[in-house]
Amino acid sequence: PVSQDLTGSTISPNTSRRVMSNYETMEEGAKIYSLQSLLTPTPKPKDDPAFKDKEGKDPVEVVSIWLGRDYLNMILNLKVSTGKGHTFGIIEDKSELETTGSVDMLLYHDADSDEEYYNRRAYISVPLKQYAESEHPTDGIKIKFRYYTYGKEADVIEDYEFEYTPGKTE
């Protein structure tokens, strides 16, 4: 239980939110020093209205990326001026999920014309549990993740591959 929350934050009862926190475990419970909500975009197909009329190819730098507890987690560096208006999403292609057991994901980032002056961090946690088969819920799934990054050429794409096993905590 939380014994002391120094953040002044409120999360409504009976709600669920993915957060990053700095805390200390104490005998009477956790003492929370900082708390930040994470972006948790649910993967959607490229023809979803959320991606309409925008390319979403604005670059990011991946600081760290890892699988954990049915999520693909990442820390990103963005170059920003105001940092306002940035939109993130995950474009999925699961056309090979049934045949090869793989899902392709592309990070959608629309900076909304924000100029690139300063570095700012973004924390994203992509839910993956929806890819687990109901008949074989622990079968592994290959996640192919791509994103646009900074480079001399426009449209520089980097990629990662992960073997996701639903329910695995590591």
What are these regions (language model features)?
Residues 42-75:
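Extracytoplasmic beta-rich ectodomain segments of secreted or membrane-anchored proteins
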Residues 138-170:
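Surface-exposed edge beta-strand/loop patches
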Residues 12-13, 131-138:
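Surface-exposed, short loops/turns at beta-strand junctions within beta-sandwich domains
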Residues 117-129:
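Aromatic sugar-binding surface patches on proteins
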Residues 24-49, 160-162:
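OB-fold/S1-family single-stranded nucleic acid-binding modules
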Residues 5-21:
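Short nucleic-acid-contacting surface segments enriched for D/E, G, S/T with interspersed K/R
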Residues 63-115:
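Short helix-loop boundary/capping segments
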